[in-house]
From Swiss-Prot:
SMART domains: HLH. Probably acts as a transcriptional activator. Mediates neuronal differentiation. Required for the regulation of amacrine cell fate specification in the retina. InterPro entries: bHLH_dom, bHLH_transcription_factors, HLH_DNA-bd_sf, NeuroD_DUF, TF_bHLH_NeuroD. This is Neurogenic differentiation factor 4. Residues 39-71 are annotated as: Disordered. It comes from the Eukaryota.
């Protein structure tokens, strides 16, 4: 009987201890929850203050940037090194393939290396030319084959192709020059030449016929020894093949029949202000050259004093 009383007392003590523990846990939970509410309230208050201060600035959106740790930096470096190695190997393979393509082209040169785009263009033209040879039965050494090969290529590449085929660098342009020469010959047989002058009206000056031009003899009289004059006349200059000047009267040598004026037909003598030296004499006074034709004087506003006719001695 006494044992049962002891067991009952022990059970009551255990229950009372459990109740005390529950009360303690509840009080601790209440304290923690109160602290959490206070912290949340303070954080909300701080955020409200920041929003009021920075109300004009937009909020940053998107994923947050992770911190760069040593492990991440190392991973990035390894990834970049691998990407560079892949790109390097790809470019090496491309260059090797282009070099093999250059070797099978009809103009392979170790000194003059074709660019990538020129190599691809030449390969396209080569395939095109070979297909034409197979279809039409043409000769691979003709000019047509060379023209197909050089279509769309630059001038140095075209010269290289022509040199390798032993046709000369300008062989592909011979037919074109011949056609141009025939066109020029046919145009030279015409009678009318059109010259455009920018500063003059077109009716009498823009167009001119060949039969309207005639060469007048020079109106200047020689003032030196006739032998020197004949020597200078025999020395002729090569003809000028460029474009002719507009058909105006220049120096009284050229004139137009339709625009001829009486003043231009007059011949004016040339008189030198200096005394002429005798070409055959050794020493002595120089003889003056006088002409009976009156000289032509231009009106000049400023005063002009001629040089005195004094004797000139040769030393």
């Amino acid at each position: 009987m006494s044992e049962m009383v002891n067991v009952h007392g022990w059970m009551e003590e255990a229950l009372s201890s459990q109740d005390e523990m529950k009360e303690r846990n509840q009080s601790a939970y209440d304290i923690i929850s109160g602290l959490c509410h206070e912290e949340r309230g303070s954080i909300d208050g701080e955020e409200d203050d920041e929003e009021e201060e920075d109300g004009e600035k937009p909020k940053k959106r998107g994923p947050k940037k992770k911190k760069m740790t040593k492990a991440r930096v190392e991973r990035f470096r390894v990834r970049r090194v691998k990407a560079n190695a892949r790109e390097r190997s790809r470019m090496h393979g491309l260059n090797d393939a282009l070099e093999n393509l250059r070797r099978v082209m009809p103009c392979y040169s170790k000194t003059q290396k074709l660019s990538k785009i020129e190599t691809l263009r030449l390969a396209r033209n080569y395939i095109w030319a070979l297909s034409d040879i197979l279809e039409q039965g043409q000769n691979a050494e003709g000019k047509g084959f060379l023209e197909i090969l050089c279509k769309g290529l630059s001038q140095p590449t075209s010269n290289l192709v022509a040199g390798c085929l032993q046709l000369g660098p300008q062989a592909m342009f011979l037919d074109k020059h011949e056609e141009k020469s025939h066109i020029c010959d046919s145009s030279l047989t015409g009678h009318t030449y059109n010259y455009q002058s920018p500063g003059l009206p077109s009716p009498p000056y823009g167009n001119i016929d060949v039969h309207h031009l005639h060469l007048k003899p020079s109106s200047f009289k020689p003032v030196m020894d006739p032998s020197v004059v004949t020597h200078t006349l025999n020395c002729t200059t090569p003809p000028y093949e460029g474009a002719l000047t507009p058909p105006l009267s220049i120096g009284g040598n050229f004139s137009l029949k339709q625009d001829s004026s009486p003043d231009m037909d007059k011949s004016y003598a040339f008189r030198s202000p200096y005394p002429a030296l005798g070409l055959g004499g050794s020493h002595g006074h120089a003889s003056h050259f006088h002409t009976s034709v009156p000289r032509y004087e231009l009106p000049i506003d400023m005063a002009y004093e001629p040089y005195p006719h004094h004797a000139i001695f040769t030393e």
